[in-house]
Amino acid sequence: MKEYDYLFKIIVIGDSGTGKSSLLLRFADNTYSESYMSTIGVDFKIKTVKIDNTTIKLQIWDTAGQERFRTITSTYYRGAHGIICVYDVTNKLSFDHITETWLQDIDKYATSNVCKLLIGNKIDLAESRVVSADEAKHVAEQNNMNYIEASAKTDSNVEKAFTTIAKALKDKVTQYPSNAPASTVSLNTASKVPTNRGLTDSCQESSVFKKMNFSSGKCT
């Protein structure tokens, strides 16, 4: 029996302190800690979700937001199928940096039709809020992004956020049903190498991902 139908790489970007790691830990492990330290470098989690009877494995990369790590994290844009931009609704600067920094990085390093999601985190801090939902929705609409407000602390809309981008990716793939590739092999197969569709014996990517202009960076 196949383990999953699709494997997608998603990266989570945004300023340090916006709660990227907390969102990922809440989604992947259902845990939350007030004392979680800022990510140094890059870490990732794997989570399998079921959408419309399709099993999707998400490989989610948690990138460091600090400026000094920007040269490290930029290498992870290539091959990403989806990108989640996170800002803190109580921190206007983190929101401004979405357009001033992070979306510019996406344009520079990611594929042109990568799926994007904007998350306004920390909505549990309503009294300290400085970024309105309307402001964020405007930015999302201008940049062809879905928008969701969430709280890693209270677990509000966290699963919805990640499943939203997973569904968007699945819908992109299934736009080309006649070219849909066969089911992928297990991640535990040591002899395999990673590609956009999962793992394969050779550096050959499926035609559906070529149509989507996705490159894993392994077959160049």
From Swiss-Prot:
| Lipidated positions per record (S-geranylgeranyl cysteine) | 219
- Predominant localisation class: membrane
GO molecular function annotations of the record: GTP binding; GTPase activity
Report the InterPro entries cross-referenced here: P-loop_NTPase, Small_GTP-bd, Small_GTPase, Small_GTPase_Rab
Q: Which UniProt keywords apply?
A: Cell membrane, GTP-binding, Lipoprotein, Membrane, Nucleotide-binding, Prenylation, Protein transport, Transport
Kindly list the places in or outside the cell where this protein is found, as annotated in its UniProt entry. Answer: Cell membrane
Annotated residues for binding of GTP: 14-21, 62-66, 121-124
Task: Tell me the disulfide pairings in this chain.
Answer: none
User: What's its membrane topology?
Assistant: Lipid-anchor
Q: Which domain of life is it from?
A: Eukaryota
What is one Gene Ontology biological process annotated in the Swiss-Prot or TrEMBL record? protein transport
Q: Which residues form a coiled coil?
A: none
**Residue numbers covered by motif Effector region:** 36-44
Cellular component (GO) terms are:
plasma membrane
Q: Which Pfam families does the record match to this protein?
A: Ras
- PROSITE patterns reported in the protein's UniProt record: RAB
Question: Cross-referenced NCBIfam families, in alphabetical order?
Answer: small_GTP
Q: Which PANTHER family match?
A: LD44762P (PTHR47980)
Q: Which family does it belong to?
A: Belongs to the small GTPase superfamily. Rab family.
Q: What does this protein do?
A: Protein transport. Probably involved in vesicular traffic from ER to Golgi.
Name listed for the protein in its UniProt record: Ras-related protein Rab-1
Q: Which organism is it from?
A: Theileria parva
Q: Which gene encodes it?
A: rab1
